[in-house]
Amino acid sequence: CAAGVAILADLGAIRNALAMIVGMNPRSPLAWDMIAMCTFIVLSIVQLVMIARDARSVKVWAVLAGLAALALQIVEGLLFSTQTAHGWWATPIMPVDFLAVAFVSGFALILLIACVKGASSKALAWLGRICASAIAVHLVLALIDLCLMFSEGTPESAGILAAVGSNILLYLVELILPFIAMIMLFLPKNRGQKKPALIASILVIVGIFAHRLMLLVPAYNAPSLSLQLSGTDFTTGPYPISPGRYLD
């Protein structure tokens, strides 16, 4: 629901929400984002109603809501990756990483709840194993994207790396805390243990929160356009978007 409200900021005004419904543009990524978001919210509400009524169809609605959640993450990732004006987002890794982060944060929250409610050691071990595996996938994707950015050697990548450097502490929190949690959950002596699972889940939640901040901060701080002037070999540089024009 909070993400649905956040779409209003992208629309510019609440009155534009009606235009999204009446005059929807199927070529717009934001339109598909709205469809996926609304579908997920509706199915989630129906599932909660079925749980409250103890209906037999709870599992069916749970599967449908789960599929809608996966589709939502893919659409969200595609929405970001198609924004070519923001080099920090414009990467094919983004949709896959969105899925990985969804599993990481989701299972970390479930693991935290399981620890608080005193779940069995077998359940904690199973949840921890899935969460740690998802963390490994996310970290590999994040490091691959960073290596690609270093090897690109373009003005856009230089601006992005500069923005990352200015937020290096936040970036390290994003990587190090989930890495520590992954090691804790993978260690045989910690499997099924409440205290390590509780600490690891908290570390993951903090790390993923830092990841979401890093998703926004470098994208908006890095120059969106580059200006290249003819005449010399050293004329390519960042061009601020604030003037509202791009000059050749």
Roles of regions detected by a PLM:
Residues 184-187, 192, 197, 201-228, ...:
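Feature marks hydrolase-like catalytic cores characterized by long aromatic- and Gly/Pro-rich stretches
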Residues 37-38, 43-200, 207-210, 214:
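Long, contiguous internal "core" modules enriched in hydrophobic/ aromatic residues
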